[in-house]
Amino acid sequence: MRYCPEYCIEVPDDFPVEELTTFMAAARSVLLQPEKGPEWREFAGATNLIGWRYRASTEDWTIYKDCWLQNGPAVNHETLYRRQRALFGMFTSGVSCVESATYALAALASHPGVASIRFDSQRQRDCSPARLRNWIEGKPKAQNLVEQLSKLCTSEDWKLWIDLRNRMSHRSNLPTIVRGAVGGAPPPAKALEFAATSSTPPLAGDLDLFDTLHVWLASTLKSLLIAGTDLCGDGR
């Protein structure tokens, strides 16, 4: 963990602190000049969530990993509950990181000195990476952000984040596969082994399977923050 001056809290080591700091300075140079406008309220609230949710996602994933390493596959219902709760928290907070960043970028882009996009109450409710990409396409200084949002929207990693979040939020837990054997030792258990559901694929892998999802998340946030700084242009 390391200290983040913007949030005044500790954040995971791989959180893009430097890119966030640069992005916030660039945004302030636009949104607070000559005075604080309505865009700042929406922007400030969303940017606070980026780091908070990233830390929460990382902490919940660490809880799952520690539980697996300490207890292995054969656990009681109470421990299974704790694991499923940790996965739910990981995916809910991880998706929130990206959605909060997207909302903050839309609020920034709505400023007359940036891209002057419409960001009324309806658009605030509808905001998503794909919609923001469409709203800013063709705007000056928005090329990098359009490219990063396009990469995000077509990413298989992002699809997995969304699908698992939605499954656990609205439909069911991820069904854990438990293997046994007759007349011999069961095959080695995997830390992550879940059956397919009506909306999610089967998953089987070791802990590094979801470690890589956090690597992707940190990299994506970094790219979005850099693109947001570019969007501010000469206002920096």
Language model feature labels by segment:
Residues Y64-C67:
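Short N-terminal edge-element motif at the start of the domain
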Residues M1-W52, A56-E59, H77-T92, S100-R236:
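Acidic, Ser/Thr/Gly/Pro-rich intrinsically disordered interaction regions
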Residues Q70:
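Conserved helix-loop functional segments at active or binding sites
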Residues P73-V75:
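Charged, low-complexity interaction regions
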